[in-house]
From Swiss-Prot:
Keywords: Fusion of virus membrane with host endosomal membrane, Fusion of virus membrane with host membrane, Glycoprotein, Host cell membrane, Host membrane, Lipoprotein, Membrane, Palmitate, Phosphoprotein, Signal, Transmembrane, Transmembrane helix, Viral envelope protein, Viral penetration into host cytoplasm, Virion, Virus entry into host cell. Envelope phosphoglycoprotein which mediates the fusion of viral and host endosomal membranes leading to virus entry into the host cell. It is found in: Virion membrane; Host cell membrane. Gene3D superfamilies: 2.40.50.710, 6.10.250.2130, 6.10.250.3010, 6.20.460.10. It is a single-pass membrane protein. This is Major envelope glycoprotein. It comes from the Viruses. A lipid is attached at residue 479 (O-palmitoyl serine).
Length: 509
């Protein structure tokens, strides 16, 4: 009997592992916690059918202007109340046929320059008021007010004109009910003006007409859209809907036409769009067509792009989080299954020296254990790590030093798709269009010539320095010399007469 007891003790001694667990200090019961898997608020919907209507960003507009300055004067002397200068400054509307011909010839037609027409010639001020017969590439008027012909009328008339085929920006507008679209021209403030190929528009001192009729094209495409649901309680509600069209981002949240510059886009929405955040409300006018200086519309569109990128990033993070939680729950099931065979698995995963004992399929107890210190061999004292356990070992030939181990890659690193900002197209301010620059320049030229000319233009001549009309200085000097010469002769004659009288007087002695 004693031999049997000794044999059992020896077996226990040589078979005991290098670690021991205390069954008296069990804790629990425990159950691995499952992680919640939440669906993202963002949904990426592919193959969304949209309709795109597009026109040219700008159109060729023929712009022309014509006018004249006229001074009809009468010189009756300073004592005559009828002495006056009647000034007329008039801008003429250019007819459609004339404007089209101007555009073809790149010349404008005016009347003959009338310079210092006096006497009967001054009647020219009442003829050829429409300005015909002289073709020029463009000219500015010269202000003349000659009135130096005594007791006569004087006429001066000078013409101005110009023509240019320039670009003006367009805006495409589509009706939400009928889907009819039209192209309008934008003025310097970005406001639509009625410039067509059939009728001349007269405004701002110029006449303008479209060189050819504006056209637009329609096409249907399938694109990808990102749907944002801010209300998790209502899965059918959509707050924003970003669609990627030709590498550009558009907000198509409502079943209406979204028009930006020269393009309109519309989709048939199946979702209920709720009220959007205060900075993005559909009941306010769209901000993408506010073509102010620095193109505010482009800046607003960049903000739309940033919102899209933020929503897309948030969707990717939420999808990743949900997927990781799903993988974690699958890993939990796998750990529970393996831990029923390897009682130290759960402790090793928690980096604690504990052992598990299962009470049911997913409930277990934990007990503290002792572990050998870190080592670089599969042997420790009289134990060997074998088949996932520390067991007794008497054969030292089975010990292996794994200090110089090698790593074996069994999977690849994940490559993420990094989103980038869309290909935003930038637009100049409306007032930067060449057509409005031409109009502004002709106004500047008119102001300059009216300020700097009076008698045909300032030069270095004495008449211009004295601010006198042509011939007026000559007449003044002639009158001055003639008057003073007559006075001189008269005085000399009187003196000679007196001298003669004194000499002929008889002497009395």
């Amino acid at each position: 009997m004693v031999r049997i007891v000794v044999f059992i003790l020896l077996c226990v001694r040589f078979s005991a592992p290098a670690e021991h667990c205390n069954a008296q200090m069990k804790s629990g019961p425990w159950r691995i916690k499952s992680l919640p898997i939440a669906a993202p608020k963002e949904t990426l919907q592919k193959d969304v059918e949209i309709e795109i209507v597009e026109t040219d960003l700008d159109q060729n507009v023929v712009i022309g202007y014509k006018g004249y300055y006229q001074a009809y004067a009468y010189n009756g002397g300073s004592l005559d109340p009828n002495s006056r200068v009647e000034e007329t400054m008039k801008t003429l509307d250019v007819a459609k046929e004339d404007l089209l011909m101007w555009g073809i010839r790149q010349q404008c037609e005016v009347g003959e320059e009338l310079i210092d027409q006096w006497g009967s010639d001054s009647e020219s001020c009442f003829r050829n008021m429409d300005g015909r017969g002289v073709w020029v590439a463009g000219k500015e008027l010269v202000k003349r007010q000659n009135n130096n012909h005594f007791a006569h009328h004087t006429c001066n008339r000078s013409w101005r004109c110009g023509v240019s085929t320039a670009k003006m920006y367009t805006r495409l507008e589509c009706d939400d009910d009928t889907d009819d679209c039209k192209v309008t021209i934008l003025d310097i403030n970005g406001t639509s003006i009625n410039v067509t190929e059939n009728k001349v528009l007269h405004r701002d001192g110029v006449s303008m007409i479209l060189k050819q009729k504006s056209t637009f094209s329609r096409r249907t495409e399938k694109v990808a859209c990102l749907l944002i649901k801010d209300d998790k309680a209502d899965p059918n509600s959509v707050t924003r809907e970003h669609c990627l069209v030709d590498n550009d981002i558009f907000d198509l949240s409502k079943n209406t036409w979204f028009c930006k510059f020269n393009r309109c886009i519309k989709r048939r929405s199946e979702n209920v769009v709720k009220q959007r955040p205060h900075t993005w409300r559909h009941d306010r006018p769209p901000k993408h067509d506010e073509g102010a200086t620095a193109t505010k519309g482009d800046l607003m569109h960049i903000q739309e792009e940033l919102m899209y990128e933020n929503d897309l990033l948030r969707m990717n993070l939420e999808l990743m989080h949900a997927h990781i939680n799903k993988l974690n729950n699958m890993m939990h099931d796998l750990i529970v299954s393996v831990a029923k065979v390897d009682e130290r698995l759960i402790g090793n995963l928690m980096n604690n020296s504990v052992s598990s004992t299962f009470l049911s399929d997913d409930t277990f107890l934990l007990m503290p254990c002792t572990s050998p210190p870190p080592h670089t061999s599969n042997c420790y004292n009289n134990s060997i790590y074998k088949e996932g356990r520390w067991v007794a070992n008497t054969d030292t030939s089975q010990c292996i030093d794994f200090n110089n181990y090698k790593e074996l890659a069994i999977d690849d690193d994940i490559e993420f798709w990094i989103p980038t900002i869309g290909n935003t197209s930038y637009h100049e301010s409306w007032k930067d269009a060449s057509g409005w620059s031409f109009i502004a320049q002709q106004k500047s030229n008119l102001i300059s010539t009216m300020e700097n000319t009076k008698f045909g233009g300032h030069t270095t001549s004495l008449s211009d320095i004295a601010d006198m009309a042509k011939g007026e200085l000559n007449a003044t000097l002639y009158s001055f010399m003639l008057g003073h010469g007559f006075t001189f002769v008269l005085i000399v004659g009187v003196i000679l007469f007196l001298v003669c009288m004194l000499r002929n007087r008889p002497s009395h002695y």
